[in-house]
UniProtKB/Swiss-Prot annotation:
It comes from Naja nigricollis (Black-necked spitting cobra). Expressed by the venom gland. This is Nawaprin. It is found in: Secreted. Damages membranes of susceptible bacteria. Has no hemolytic activity. Not toxic to mice. Does not inhibit the proteinases elastase and cathepsin G. GO terms for molecular function: peptidase inhibitor activity.
Length: 51
């Protein structure tokens, strides 16, 4: 179940890099409105989406 919104563009990572380990497999594993997105390290973490 994908949540609404988009993952932030990681070519301009904010915050830089993020947590360098996988913390989720899908959006449904993330709390509230957060999505499972690839962070600047290339790992999947729960991230607040951009509209």
């Amino acid at each position: 179940n994908e949540k609404s919104g988009s993952c932030p563009d990681m070519s301009m990572p904010i915050p830089p890099l993020g947590i360098c380990k996988t913390l989720c497999n899908s959006d449904s594993g993330c709390p509230n409105v957060q999505k499972c997105c690839k962070n600047g390290c290339g790992f999947m973490t729960c991230t607040t989406p951009v509209p």
